[in-house]
Design a protein with these regions (language model features):
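Positively charged n-region of N-terminal signal peptides that target proteins for export
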Residues: 1-5
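Bacterial N-terminal signal peptides
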Residues: 9-19
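Low-complexity, Gly/Pro
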Residues: 22-27, 223
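N-terminal Sec/ER secretory leader and immediately downstream segment
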Residues: 25-100
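Stable alpha-helical elements in mature extracytoplasmic
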Residues: 50, 100-107, 204-207, 211
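Sec-exported extracytoplasmic/periplasmic mature domains
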Residues: 55, 109-116, 216-220
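Conserved polar/disulfide-associated segments of primarily extracytoplasmic proteins
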Residues: 71-162
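Short, well-structured beta-strand
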Residues: 144-222
Length: 223
């Protein structure tokens, strides 16, 4: 199945639950601020609304830009379920460690429940856990982000049920950076995740960090 169709099906399925039309959701996903989130990679992806219809428990409002590794939905691939995404939210929405922990957990609980419900599988999402710890310093930050932005880095571990391919328990590891951008008057959360434990010499994590390092935001002050 093509990736764009997969994402659209997730959105449409969750939309039916929230009594919105698919057209409304698609329009909302494209209603982004006058900024461009630039990923210098060949990885493909999508832009969707925050909160996404499949995770109505989330409180953050804005946009999410995603880039999926080749092999993202191939359980036999070395890049299975490895990807990067960015949350872009207005400057009045703080991205503290506590908020990040709650929002990421709500995101993945909703995602798993939405997909597994279509497969008649109980996600048991209340048992999902997401541990988050702030790192001593932020390393490999986006080179186009001003040093004055003072990015904060976190390491995380999610225990959940992977819903797309295996419908089995999975552990995802996270490397997250957040910063405020005065040029666009927005806060950003850059997330790298993979079922592979984080490692300096791991090829998957090296690529994820390269994508983050080359990421940039273009545009003027948004909403």
């Amino acid at each position: 199945m093509k990736l764009s169709r997969l994402i659209l099906q997730i959105v449409i399925s969750a939309t039916a639950i929230s009594n919105l039309s698919a057209a409304d959701v698609i329009a909302a996903a494209s209603d982004a601020p006058d900024t461009t989130l630039v990923f210098n990679t060949t990885w493909k992806g999508e832009r969707i609304q925050l909160p996404p219809p499949f995770a109505p428990a989330m409180k953050l409002k804005g946009t999410e830009e995603i880039r999926f590794a080749p092999g993202m939905f191939d359980a036999g691939s070395a890049l299975f379920f490895s990807y990067a995404f960015v949350f872009s939210v207005s400057k009045d929405q703080a991205l503290t460690g506590d908020i990040i922990q709650m929002e990421i957990l709500a995101y993945y609980r909703g995602l798993s429940e939405s997909i597994l419900k279509r497969k008649n599988v109980n996600a048991d999402a209340d048992k999902f856990t997401f541990k988050l710890q702030q790192a001593k310093e932020a390393t490999g930050t986006p080179e186009k982000v001003a040093a004055s932005a003072k990015a904060v880095q976190y390491h995380g571990e999610l225990k959940w049920t992977e819903p797309f391919v295996t419908a089995k328990p999975q552990v995802l590891y996270f490397e997250i950076q957040s910063w405020a951008d005065p040029a666009t008057s927005r806060n950003y959360l850059f997330v790298c995740t993979s079922p592979k434990p984080r490692g300096d010499a791991d090829a998957t994590w090296m690529e994820l960090r390269n994508i983050r390092r080359s990421f940039e935001v273009k545009g003027s002050s948004g909403k």
